């Protein structure tokens, strides 16, 4: 994105990159998922959630980004892969300052996650979600008809069948709002990751 001329802010959310928390535990090395779940359990004991902390990181990052004079505040997109896709999904629902979003390798359905026995990181399912009858798509519907591209991979553990199902459900709402052209789906032909094919789909939206 930066090479294409965009102003870009890439944050290290808590428990990733330079913000790893458990440096004295070699068994956590190489996998941020361990950290997410250990810290997530600690936060639950205090009435907090890992997802809320990570979302707040993104919100405060957005505060800073929009304070920069070179940033066009009328065109602000959010994207990320895996944990970044999770963050994009939830922050997109929360933030009215965003104008487009591209979650990658997170969107599927809760049912597919259960059927595939997919272990989830602490932040991936906000407490009360299932009790409220919410699906992943509901977090995308919350900001319809904001321009959106849903990205997945054919060999991802976030089941691409669920990705397609969610996309179709969300697209119905966009259609009702007269904005079907504002939502897109790209399923790449690879494993869990932000492939060139998917990045190109995101560039075309942004």
Predicted regions and their residues:
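Cap/lid segment of the alpha/beta-hydrolase catalytic domain
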Residues: 1-59, 66-67, 73, 108-117
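Loop/turn elements at helix/coil->beta-strand transitions in domains of secreted/extracellular proteins
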Residues: 4-7, 72-75, 96-100, 144-148, ...
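Alpha/beta-hydrolase-fold catalytic nucleophile elbow
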Residues: 12, 79, 104-105, 151, ...
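Flexible loop/turn segments at secondary-structure boundaries
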Residues: 16-20, 85-88, 108-113, 140, ...
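Alpha/beta-hydrolase fold nucleophile elbow
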Residues: 70-82
């Amino acid at each position: 994105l930066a090479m294409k001329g965009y102003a870009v802010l890439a944050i290290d959310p808590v428990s990733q990159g330079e913000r790893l928390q458990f440096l004295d535990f070699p068994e956590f090395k190489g996998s941020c998922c361990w950290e997410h779940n250990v810290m997530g359990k600690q936060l639950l004991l205090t009435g907090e959630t890992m997802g809320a902390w990570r979302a707040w990181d993104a919100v405060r990052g957005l505060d800073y980004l929009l304070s920069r004079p070179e940033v066009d505040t009328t065109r602000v997109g959010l994207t990320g892969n895996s944990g970044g896709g999770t963050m994009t999904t939830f922050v997109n629902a929360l933030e009215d300052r965003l104008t487009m979003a591209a979650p990658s390798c997170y969107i599927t359905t809760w049912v597919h996650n259960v059927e595939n026995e997919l272990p989830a990181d602490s932040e991936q399912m906000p407490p009360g979600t299932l009790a409220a009858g919410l699906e992943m798509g509901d977090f995308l519907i919350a900001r319809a008809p904001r321009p959106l591209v849903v990205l997945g991979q054919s060999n991802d553990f976030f089941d691409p069948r669920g990705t397609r199902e969610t996309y179709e459900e969300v697209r119905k709402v966009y259609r009702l709002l007269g904005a079907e052209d504002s939502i897109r789906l790209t399923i790449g032909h690879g494993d869990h990751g932000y492939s060139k094919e998917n990045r190109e789909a995101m560039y075309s939206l942004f």
